[in-house]
């Protein structure tokens, strides 16, 4: 079977390394490549994918929303998130999914098993936040809060959870067991501070969905304060495993995928 990841730029993507490691571990001769498709060429997506004879593909920035009009069917999770990161091509039909939310929550559950009783704060109200919130709401609905700089961003949300401003989030920070940053603040080249951690409880798990850099500024600050931290590496691995399951109906080798990504990050 043939797979790929599409984006622009895409040369930095670790998806090919991760998926190929999984294929090798499972003894599969499947292929996975990175395809750079600029925005101005995206209208040719059907033609490009057809020529490659792909069985499925991942979509990353900046095409997660742009792909939706080209799909024949969109899964409920992807509709809720307003973004697609996985496409299955079956009998000529393109089916869109979003595995980011379930990928993050599966990883989080492995390091924080008592999610059901956790008070959780999500920073940011973009597509990534929405996907994670919808998935977390299955476990922690009464105790889930999302904070954003502007409240207007919540107008497209159809989820009954607590919605507060970032200013209020700073005030009540000590009340949360887990704080998750889903904003671009702290990504490579972005040193913006999203929130003041002055009131962060020492028992709070501080998380970020970014894994490059391995420790974002908000994670470094929390670690200096003595908090446990959790980055986005597991989310990346688990969302990839979920994509593989959608494409093949097989379980991925999580360990081989994570090891391959870690080796790449360390330059091995």
Swiss-Prot record:
Could you tell me which Gene3D superfamilies the record lists for this protein?
A: Leucine Dehydrogenase, chain A, domain 1, NAD(P)-binding Rossmann-like Domain
- Binding of NADP(+), residues: 76, 124-128, 148-153, 209, 232
User: Which reaction equation describes what this protein catalyses?
Assistant: shikimate + NADP(+) = 3-dehydroshikimate + NADPH + H(+)
* Known partners and oligomeric status: Homodimer.
UniProt cross-references to InterPro entries, sorted A to Z: Aminoacid_DH-like_N_sf (IPR046346), NAD(P)-bd_dom_sf (IPR036291), SDH_C (IPR041121), Shikimate_DH (IPR011342), Shikimate_DH-bd_N (IPR013708), Shikimate_DH_fam (IPR022893), Shikm_DH/Glu-tRNA_Rdtase (IPR006151)
Q: What is its EC number?
A: 1.1.1.25
PANTHER family named in the record: BIFUNCTIONAL 3-DEHYDROQUINATE DEHYDRATASE_SHIKIMATE DEHYDROGENASE, CHLOROPLASTIC, SHIKIMATE DEHYDROGENASE
A Pfam family matched by this chain, by name?
SDH_C
Transmembrane segment boundaries: none
> Member of which family?
Belongs to the shikimate dehydrogenase family.
| UniProtKB keywords | Amino-acid biosynthesis, Aromatic amino acid biosynthesis, NADP, Oxidoreductase
The UniProt entry's GO biological process terms, in alphabetical order, are: amino acid biosynthetic process; aromatic amino acid family biosynthetic process; chorismate biosynthetic process; shikimate metabolic process
GO MF, one example: shikimate 3-dehydrogenase (NADP+) activity
Naming one, the record's GO cellular component terms include: cytosol
What is this protein called in UniProt?
Shikimate dehydrogenase (NADP(+))
Which residues are involved in binding shikimate? 13-15, 60, 85, 100, 211
What's the superkingdom here? Bacteria
Task: Show the active-site residues.
Answer: 64 (proton acceptor)
């Amino acid at each position: 079977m043939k797979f790929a990841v599409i984006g622009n730029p895409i040369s930095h993507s670790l998806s090919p390394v991760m998926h190929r490691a999984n294929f090798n571990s499972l003894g599969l001769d499947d292929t996975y490549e990175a395809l750079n498709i600029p925005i101005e060429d995206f209208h040719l997506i059907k033609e490009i994918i057809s020529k490659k004879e792909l069985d499925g593909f991942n979509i990353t920035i900046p095409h997660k929303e742009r792909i939706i009009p080209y799909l024949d069917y969109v899964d409920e999770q992807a509709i809720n998130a307003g973004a697609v990161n996985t496409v299955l091509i079956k009998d000529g039909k393109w089916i869109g999914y979003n595995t980011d939310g379930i990928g993050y929550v599966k990883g989080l559950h492995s390091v924080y098993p008592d999610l059901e009783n956790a008070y959780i704060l999500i920073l940011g109200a973009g597509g990534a936040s929405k996907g994670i919130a919808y998935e977390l709401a299955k476990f922690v609905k009464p105790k889930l809060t999302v904070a954003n700089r502007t409240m207007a961003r919540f107008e497209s949300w159809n989820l009954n959870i607590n919605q507060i401003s970032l200013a209020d989030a700073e005030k009540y920070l000590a009340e949360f067991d887990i704080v998750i940053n889903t904003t671009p603040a702290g990504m490579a080249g972005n040193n913006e501070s999203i929130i003041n951690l002055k009131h962060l409880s020492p028992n709070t798990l501080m998380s970020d969905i970014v894994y490059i850099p391995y420790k974002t500024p908000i994670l470094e600050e929390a670690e200096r304060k003595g908090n446990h931290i959790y980055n986005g590496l597991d989310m990346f691995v688990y969302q990839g495993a979920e994509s593989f399951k959608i494409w093949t109906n097989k379980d991925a080798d999580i360990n081989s995928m994570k090891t391959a990504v870690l080796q790449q990050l360390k330059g091995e």
